Amino acid sequence: MGSSIKLERHDTTTVITLDRPDVLNAIDVELRETLITLLTELNKDDAVRAVVLTGAGDRAFCSGQDLDEISRYTANDIDSWLTRQHAMYAAVRDLDKPCIVAFNGVAAGAGFQIALCADLRVGYPEMKLGQPEIKAGLASIVGSYLMTMHLGLSKNIELSLTGELISGQVAHEIGILNHLVPRAEVMNKSLALAAAMSKLGPTAMRLTKQRFRKLTQPGFDDVLEEAKIAQKEAYASGEPQEAIRKFLEARKSRRD
């Protein structure tokens, strides 16, 4: 297992912690590939009946893609990058056992999308989450598709086109968060849900989850190719590179 992920067992539940707190648990190649491998292995382990995803530290579940890494990307990197990102989301979707996200902080971009691929989401009123890709010069393609499974079109358009994050309170009101609890109770609530769902028949659980995947699989497959086309055009325009450069410079100034 890579150093960017921690694993804990709680009876029949496995807790996966994204462990890059110094960069708000941003997704780089190592974290992504480790997560894909780990989820695939856990799906084959009959002793594991539920999975809880969370992040290290008290600031972020996952802030999205590691901007230091993708600042070096060009249009030629889009195919391989997005193919592997899609594989990460698929690894979450393809779990035949319950997958619950326990939000310990902000969830943005790819981190938000991981959460949307899970079965249940537990958060707290003050947290922030959303789809800020457009502020980084990137088209919101995968995120806007995943939100269609949770939101009406009007709110989806608003979040995708403004890039603004919403509070946990609002996310619960519009149906993104399944459970809203005080911050200190998020993990306990998530583990309780996982324990209860672990007691249900694993065959019925697998078949029910497979049915939900079948209902949404055509769109999930199509969105990868749509995202590749859109992000190649975005990168060819130079907008992502410029937006990311400005963000990284501003971040460096704040740290200096």
Task: Locate the predicted segments by residue.
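Crotonase-fold acyl-CoA enzyme core
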Residues: 91-203, 237, 242
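Amphipathic alpha-helical segments at domain termini/boundaries
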Residues: 1-19, 164-198, 206-216, 242-256
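Glycine- (often His-adjacent) and acidic-residue-rich active-site loop
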Residues: 4, 55-91, 219
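Charged catalytic carboxylate motif
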Residues: 30-34, 84, 91, 189, ...
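Conserved CoA-thioester-binding segment of acyl-CoA-metabolizing enzymes
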Residues: 1-54, 90
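Structural motif
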Residues: 13-17, 52-54, 74, 100-102, ...
